[in-house]
């Protein structure tokens, strides 16, 4: 019988190495790796209140989310952020545009909203699940990014196609894996769906 000498030598080296390391470690100081754990955040029972203020739109939002004016450099009128307290793990960004009875302007807003989502999908090599909105207040699309680490995992836009255009997006300003934040993401997504279900244009 012929043996493959390189293979035999490799096997013997593996056995010797295993015996050497096991002899150097006692039972007390041997290291057993522990699985990574995810931090846990207690979430309150969901409760809602009507949006206050002079906005061209209305909805019910979480009582635990503070409404803050968007003060970024490119912010426009009626742009707001819903910040959850005290965790502030997830935020909901609301942007608003006037359509001005301009079909080209409407399509520009739609394309911009889709472009933002698809750019994040391509960056994270993720996929999106979309749902069409068809209600008395207009039409739109809901996007859920199914996997990958992206800052926006859930967003939607809604418009009456002639006067108003609104986009709502959940942002997660953290580098943690989205899997570890699953309960918070679901909680915030449910809040956003409630916002959509109670959504109305004011004028």
Give the location of each predicted region.
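N-terminal targeting sequences that direct proteins away from the cytosol to non-cytosolic compartments
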Residues: 2-6, 19-90, 101-107, 123-132, ...
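Sec-dependent N-terminal signal peptides
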Residues: 6-14
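Intrinsically disordered, low-complexity coil segments
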Residues: 14-19, 146
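His/Glu-rich zincin catalytic helix
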Residues: 93
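Short beta-strand-to-loop capping motifs
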Residues: 96-98
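Signature of long, low-cysteine stretches enriched in small and polar/charged residues
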Residues: 111-167
């Amino acid at each position: 019988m012929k043996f493959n000498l390189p293979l035999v030598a490799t096997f013997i080296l593996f056995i010797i190495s295993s015996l050497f390391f096991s002899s150097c470690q006692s039972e007390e100081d041997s290291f057993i790796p522990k699985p990574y754990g995810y931090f846990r955040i207690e979430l309150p029972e969901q409760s809602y209140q009507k949006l206050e203020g002079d906005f061209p739109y209305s909805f019910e939002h979480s009582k635990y989310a503070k409404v803050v004016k968007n003060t970024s450099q490119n912010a426009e009128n009626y742009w707001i952020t819903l910040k959850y307290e005290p965790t502030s793990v997830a935020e909901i960004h609301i942007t608003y545009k006037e359509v001005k009875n301009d079909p080209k302007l409407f399509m520009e807003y739609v394309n911009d909203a889709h472009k933002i989502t698809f750019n994040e999908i391509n960056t994270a090599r993720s996929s999106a699940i979309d749902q069409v909105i068809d209600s008395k207040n207009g039409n739109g699309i809901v996007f859920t990014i199914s996997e990958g680490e992206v800052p926006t995992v859930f967003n939607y836009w809604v418009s009456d196609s002639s006067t108003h255009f609104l986009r709502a997006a959940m942002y997660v300003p953290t580098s943690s894996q989205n899997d570890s934040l699953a309960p918070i993401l679901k909680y915030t997504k449910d809040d956003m769906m409630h916002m959509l279900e109670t959504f109305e244009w004011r004028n």
